[in-house]
Amino acid sequence: MLDAFSRVVVNSDTKAAYVGGSDLQALKKFIADGNKRLDSVNAIVSNASCVVSDAVSGMICENPGLITPGGNCYTNRRMAACLRDGEIIIRYVSYALLSGDPSVLEDRCLNGLKETYIALGVPTNSNARAVDIMKASVVALINNTATLRKMPTPSGDCSALAAEAGSYFDRVNSALS
C-alpha cells in the first residue's frame, strides 16, 4: 500500500531523480486539500452503516428474489454476510480516499473478490448494483447534496474528491465484472 507521498518517492527513486515538477505540485495540492479529504472520509465512515444498509435494501427492492428461500440474502446469516461485505468495501474505499491511492483497495479487498463470489454462488450483478448505490450515496455525502445525514459534510468544492471516491467504487465494479 502506498500513500500519495510514498508513491512519489518510489517513482522518483526508480528514475534516480529528485522529487520535483509535477510530482511536487501534486503533493502540494494533496496537502492543500487535506482537510477536505479528512472531512470527506469522516463523512463516509460516519454514515457507512446507513449507506451500506440503504444499498443492500435498494438491491433487494430491485431483485426481491434475493430474500426468498434459495436467494442469496435469505436467512439472517446470508443477509449479515451481505451487509458485512458492503461494510468491508466501503471501509477500503475510505482507506483509499484517505491515502489518495487505490493500492490498499486493490491489494486487500479486490484481489480475488470476483472469484470468491463466484465460488460462493453470489450473483455479481446484484453486488454491482449495491456498489452503484453506495457510490451514489458517498458522492452525495462528499458533495454535500445528501439529505437526512448524521453529521455535517465537507464544505467548499469537493467535486474532485467525490470523483476520486467514485473512481474507487468503479474499481470495485470492474473487479466484479
Curated annotation (Swiss-Prot):
Record key words, sorted: Antenna complex, Bile pigment, Chloroplast, Chromophore, Electron transport, Membrane, Methylation, Photosynthesis, Phycobilisome, Plastid, Thylakoid, Transport
Membrane topology (UniProt): Peripheral membrane protein
Modified residues annotated as N4-methylasparagine in this record: N72
Residues that, per the record, bind (2R,3E)-phycoerythrobilin 1: C82
Domain of life where this protein originates: Eukaryota
Compartments, record wording: Plastid, Chloroplast thylakoid membrane
Binding positions ((2R,3E)-phycoerythrobilin 2): C158
Single GO biological process annotation from the record: photosynthesis
A Gene Ontology cellular-component term: phycobilisome
Positions annotated to bind phycourobilin: C50, C61
Gene3D superfamilies: Phycocyanins (1.10.490.20)
Keyword set includes Transferase: no
Chief subcellular location: plastid
Modification comment: Contains two covalently linked phycoerythrobilin chromophores and one covalently linked phycourobilin chromophore.
Subunit structure comment from the entry: Heteromer of 6 alpha, 6 beta and one gamma chain.
Family as reported in the entry's similarity comment: Belongs to the phycobiliprotein family.
Primary role: Light-harvesting photosynthetic bile pigment-protein from the phycobiliprotein complex.
Record protein name field: B-phycoerythrin beta chain
